[in-house]
């Protein structure tokens, strides 16, 4: 029994060792292609067993992914290692697979105005040393910046030019000139950035920050500003001659849900009566005025024809003559008729009337 137990233990140990080797060792018909720089493993073996896997397809995919990952890890253990802060790190080689970009390749930055001018004139940049010899201090100093050589800001005496005002402060003038140069350089930098991004720059002439606003727009803006307070403009003071805003918001008043049922019934019945009435509603006043206008126009046309016939027979009358024995409708005042004083030419369609169309009056010579 003891011999069998020892044999069983040895057999079990061999099986465990074989299982460990089986987990680490993976056999493939075609070797995988590795790109250790990108931690990439490409399997060129056709997945023949996945076509007829059926319900075990998910398990087959997991087993295949596990085997390929094991092969990739086996390759990583063969790389040279180094210890960094008590940790063992493998040094990856350069990647060999070119991965696609998420965004397009950036375009070359356009040249600035100075670069364009330098290329046109053939000016090439010359490298200058950062240190130069300062004759005043007798030591090497920086060419630019803090503690530079020939620093004019440290001078205690400035010579006044011959064409300058002797009472002008040359120190303040130099500081102002430097501020202007800095502002000009900043403006040129912003212009170069705008040209690089193809932005439309506003013209210097006719540039308005807020644009031209009409009277209505200004009034609307003022009204909105007044009601933008915590009290919604209720305690906002007004100017002495300020007019009340027109078209201000008003609360909608709805009819109560429970209240005067008689008024609600009356309004509903009136609406049904209007909808069910077959005869259209006629405006009597408008129809009467229209009929009177048509009659006046017909009568005026007849009188115009009669006046033209009288001109051919009797000649033209003087400007101050008045007709006698005319029809009663040609003189005086009447309601809704034609009348009034008449001058030379065709009879005037004038006079005072109610409900008619005012078509004339006294005519000039």
Curated annotation (Swiss-Prot):
Species of provenance: Bos taurus (Bovine)
Entry comment on modification after translation: Citrullinated by PADI4.
Sites of Phosphoserine modification: 5
Record's signal peptide: none
Cross-link (Glycyl lysine isopeptide (Lys-Gly) (interchain with G-Cter in SUMO2)): 154, 226, 266
Name of this chain's protein: Ribosome biogenesis regulatory protein homolog
Annotated positions of the Citrulline modification: 273
InterPro entries: Ribosom_reg
Region (Disordered): 202-221, 229-254, 273-365
